[in-house]
């Protein structure tokens, strides 16, 4: 079904924002209770997570400015999550605040959360619930003309694959 979002973090706030903007992304919303922003262009959602003491902050401290998580659209997130666990995936718990969606996630490479999202319709998406859109800002900016993400890689460090294959 595709990608819902890519989550980024940096140990130094202010590092990634100008890069997103140069690429044509606009900040369109802020999280209701966390130091997290939503950048968007076309149907591409980038989450910039600057929340202290979060999985994202620990990931950024270890890896530097980087992708610290990603979300995939699925028909039924709980069913997909349970199936992933049956196949050996490791669950990962993400702290949620009041009035915030609990997003099922499994542990990806380097501990990056891989979220499974089944709420992506206009008006009931995780952005409509967890974020506040900025006044006077287009919610779906055209930006530089990028429309969707069709693929990306989830790379491993050289020689780390031996630890994963047993």
Language model features with spans:
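Conserved small/polar residues in nucleotide/adenosyl-binding loops
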Residues: 162-166
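An N-terminus-focused feature that recognizes amino-terminal "leader" regions
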Residues: 1-134
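Acyltransferase donor/substrate-recognition loop-hinge adjacent to the catalytic core
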Residues: 114-161
């Amino acid at each position: 079904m595709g990608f819902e979002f890519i989550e980024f973090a940096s140990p130094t706030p202010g590092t990634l924002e100008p890069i997103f903007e140069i690429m044509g992304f606009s900040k369109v919303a802020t999280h209701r209770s966390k130091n997290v922003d939503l950048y968007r262009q076309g149907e591409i959602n980038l989450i910039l997570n600057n929340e202290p003491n979060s999985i994202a902050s620990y990931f950024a401290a270890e890896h530097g400015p980087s992708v610290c998580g990603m979300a995939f659209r699925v028909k039924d997130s709980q069913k997909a999550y349970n199936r992933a666990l049956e196949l050996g995936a490791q669950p990962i718990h993400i702290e949620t605040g009041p009035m915030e969606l609990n997003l099922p996630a499994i542990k990806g490479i380097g501990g990056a959360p891989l979220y499974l999202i089944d709420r992506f319709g206009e008006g009931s998406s995780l952005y409509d619930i967890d974020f506040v859109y900025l006044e006077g800002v287009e919610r779906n900016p055209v930006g530089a003309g990028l429309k969707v993400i069709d693929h990306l890689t989830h790379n491993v460090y050289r020689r780390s694959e031996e630890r994963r294959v047993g």
